[in-house]
A protein has these predicted regions:
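Bacterial N-terminal signal peptides that target proteins for export
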Residues: 1-8
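C-terminal motif of bacterial Sec signal peptides marking the signal peptidase cleavage site
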Residues: 15-18
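Bacterial signal peptide processing site
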Residues: 20-22
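Metallo-beta-lactamase
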Residues: 26-27, 31, 35-37, 42, 74-75, 82-83, 168-171, 175-239, ...
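Conserved beta-strand hairpin/beta-sheet module of binuclear metal-dependent hydrolase folds
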Residues: 43-89, 177-191
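Divalent metal-coordination and catalytic microenvironments
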Residues: 46, 69, 79, 94, ...
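Active-site metal-binding motif and surrounding structural segment of the metallo-beta-lactamase
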Residues: 73-76, 85-128
Length: 261
């Protein structure tokens, strides 16, 4: 009887693991929209990465990621596309193809790959939210500033679910925040988080000395992340946090990979 019970428990355990793995693997990422200036890739049932391209003199079109979180025909967006033209295109696609309501836009820091298309969102009467320091820095640099500020963190409802935007400290900039979607254990790290094998990138507004500790704070707060989306490059899992922590703890020689402001 003991042997039979052990076999039964083993079968049940294997079945549970198999079901879990199947659930994790059942959604295959797919490109759902593409034009010359904008791409949208669905990565889960509720989340999409929007990628627009920042034209530079030396590096051509630099791809820049943002995140769309959806539930019950509502969306909240982290980071605008890089300019108003690509932002117009994204807003039109969400409204006319998804038929979803855009409840808000959250730029994760003050650079143009986060709020370069903010004018378009405001023209469409979409409210914008940002960390207080982001608004201050946007105004200092004569950029269009987000409308609504938060001191440390912000919780917003999207459909029946909740998203969090929060500052964990300085890194890529003084004002960088991350976005977290608890129901899918998904983190939008923006330019604070690097894709695997990336170099340090643009450091003109960075605090390199504390970058690693800031990401360590994120890792401690969200220990069960399944997906992590960086501001540039390929998304992955929590391994991107470890890579970023290591990158800014040690010296890495060689030419830095370009990352836009």
């Amino acid at each position: 009887m003991k042997v039979g019970r052990t076999i039964l428990l083993t079968i049940l355990a294997v079945s549970l693991i198999t079901c879990k793995n199947s659930k994790e693997e059942e959604f295959k990422p797919k490109l759902v929209y593409e034009s010359a200036i904008l791409q949208v890739t669905q990565i889960t049932e509720n989340c999409f990465i929007h990628t627009s391209f920042l034209q530079t003199n030396d590096f051509g079109n630099v791809p820049c990621n943002g995140l769309i979180v959806s539930d019950s025909k509502e969306v909240i967006i982290f980071d605008t596309p890089v300019n108003d033209k690509s932002a117009d295109e994204l807003i039109k696609w969400i409204k006319e193809t998804l038929h979803y309501k855009i409840k808000g836009i959250i730029p994760t820091h003050f650079h143009d790959d986060c709020l370069g298309g903010l004018k378009s969102f405001h023209a469409n009467k979409i409210p914008s939210y940002a960390y207080l320091k982001t608004i201050e820095l946007a105004k200092e640099n004569n950029f269009i500033a987000p409308q609504n500020s938060f001191n440390d963190s912000l919780l917003l409802k999207v459909g029946d679910k909740t998203i969090l935007a929060k500052s964990f400290g300085e890194g890529h900039t003084k004002d960088n925040v991350v976005g977290y979607f608890p129901s899918e254990e998904l983190l939008f790290g923006g330019c604070l988080i690097k894709e695997l094998d990336a170099t340090k990138g643009y450091l003109g507004d960075a605090n390199v000395a504390v970058w690693s500790s800031t990401v360590e704070n994120i890792k401690k707060r969200f220990p069960n992340l399944t997906l992590v989306v960086p501001g540039h490059g390929k998304y992955g899992n929590a391994e991107l946090l470890d890579y970023t922590i290591d990158l800014f703890k040690t010296k890495h020689f060689g030419e830095d990979k370009f990352e836009s402001k």
